[in-house]
Amino acid sequence: LASTLLLALGYNKSEIVNEFYEKEQFTFDQKTEKWKTKFNPENYKAKNFSEEVIDAKTGKVVIKRGEKINFLNAKKLANEGLKDILVSKESLFGKFLHKDVKINDEESGIFKIGTELNDTVIQQILDSDINTLEISITNSINKGPYLLTTILNDKNNTKDEAITEIYKMLRPGEPPTIEIATQIFNNLFFSSDRY
């Protein structure tokens, strides 16, 4: 996995996500039962909306359900004063968490970086009195969720675990020690004699 190599190089999962993805913050508005976020035209390149988008300040619908919007339309809305928008929870479905969200003290009570949002996940987060989510910005043009799903599925969490995993692939059957695994890893990628 690509994330295993980056972990072995000393990055943690949060640093990897921050390096490759920008984030967007959504806050639950209990009065409207919608999610509020800043309107950034950069995030709206050739996008079809399955749900309506509401101006948080005026309460007016600014993007209708089924409407297609591109960067120029989005820029025009921003120039007309659109700053914050309200969206339904359904518009968050299929988006990915930018950081871990802890909903209780148990190990299983954490939604990890890269978790895809759906009705159940959002409801469990709201039931835990968490009203703000950081979502990684992805799109179908040039920023797919591939690394996010890789990070979510990577069982390694530390540099040592990742180096040991790489060692097991390079030398299957040999019992790894972290010292030997680190030496092999460093010789493989950082040896001046080799490169």
Spans of features found by a protein language model:
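N-terminal non-catalytic structural scaffold regions of very large proteins
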Residues: 1-195
